[in-house]
Amino acid sequence: VLGLGIFVLQLGEAGLVDETPPLFAGAARAMAETGDWLTPRVNGLPRYDKPPLIYWLMGLVYALPDHARFDPLGSWAAGLPSALSSIGVMLALCATLLRWPQPSLGPGGERLPRRPARSAVVAALAFALSPLVLLWGRIGVSDALLSGCLAVSLLLLWQAWADPGRPWWPGWLVLGLAVLAKGPVAVVLAGLTLVGFGWHQGSLPALWARLKAGRGLVITALVAVPWYAAMLVVEGQPFWDSFFGYHNLQRFSSVVNDHLQPWWFFLPVLVIASLPFTPLLLLGLKRGLARTPRAPQHSLRSFAAWWLLAVLVFFTMAATKLPSYWLPATPAAGLLISLAAQDGESGRRDGEGRGAGAGRWFLLAQAATVLLTTTVAVALWVSHTWIPLIKDPEMPTLTAELTASGFVERAALFWTLAALVGLLCLWRVVPGWLLGLQLPLVAFHLFALLPLWQLGDGVRQRPVREMAASVQREIRPSEALAMVGVLKPSLHYYTGRVVIYEGISVDGMVNLSDRLRHEQREGQQPSTRAEAPTVLVVIDHNTSQLPYWRAVQGEELDRAGIYRLWRVDRARLESAAAALVNRGAGRPSWRDPRPERY
């Protein structure tokens, strides 16, 4: 129920979030419309960067009868796989801790928790309330799906290790789905986790034998390889170069898309991704890495620690670094947070004094957690001092609307309530203190964060949807559609038309003029001025004020937010573009090799 509230409630009430989710949604909808479930395509071009599982799951929803009636913005279908994946992780964490309760570690020795259900719910909420999970668990990209498939796979593999009576093969089968979600990185992360854990336990050969790794990898390959093989047969070298060469090897070995980050990038990400429970995560990680081999059924803490380390080490080594790369570590973080909190309560269940069974490290972690919660609450109460500092040219009215909404003060109220619960538990022995702190944060998400999401959608995305509606009304049968300056793939999704995207540079105008005459893609044919004398252009205000765009004297048909809809005479466009080329100010660069385009 909590998972449904956190991830599914109001899922389709805000539109697609630019820039990446509309590309996923557009490719999935194209599969449903064309019946081609092999090759993802968006905006008239193949999309090779991700495997098909996310597109298949979205596409199944898009293919439902009357889909447009119950999901007019398309965001319910796009976000549902991520939401269900996140709920699946919550259920898997709960099921694992309920079936295999982990002993608490404390000065009084080890003992099993009296209420394992509490630890199970705390772990699920520690995962779900991660700022990264709250964001990526509701949007239409493949990161949450990878995280969910990998988490279920690893938990099933650990269960097979913990209980010899459990089947060994389900984990490998789900790992194949993880490979279909985002590629071979899933096998690498699973392998690093198992090797590190097996070495730490001093039982790597036994682990490998119990899990039947060789046969397991064959099962993984049987699930994943057929699609890759079919793509190589049908699409050939372009797919190999793009998916394996650029989106996997090159992303690991060199920086792409300007995502250059220092080697320590994921250390602050680790801290932020578990707020406000990061101190408990660090304590749980420390105890999970303690050099004490344990019985298989009691080794989940160590397994989670090596799971988290596998993600940290692998993506730290990668040249390209993004915050979303940390998402596969968040289920492990949820386990470590819950078990650290369980340790702190182990001595209290029999009425012992405050801190018994927990030790000073737990008291420090508990106090630091409450301090972080209080800090966030204070920062939200004084939001009037920092909200005016938000300057985003794409959302010029955000500051005023955020201040007037009252949603930030509502968020401050829930964080204050969580801080008060935490402070109370510092002074009195309260079983389940972390669950008591988590529940106000669930309310924060439901009653403050979701309304803030809706507000942001209205400021940032609604103007694009309004432009799309204007395009549908104004476009002529012969006209092409272009967007220049600020580029939003959701324009393609909401118009259902091929959009020629060009940036703010001088080359953008030259490219647009040349592409109208020469570029051919599915849904877009080249044309002469006689065949199509005008072109519809969606242009943002700042770009429209540049001298070379003012020279085309576009006829303004509509405006919404920062965007303008122009009808541009192609004769003027070609004349202005030719003048730029003759002056050496621009050139047609759209034919240059580019690893990513849409």
Language model segments and positions:
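Membrane-embedded architecture of ER/inner-membrane glycosylation machinery
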Residues: 169, 287-598
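Membrane-integral, polyisoprenol-dependent glycosyltransferases
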Residues: 1-348, 381-384, 560-562
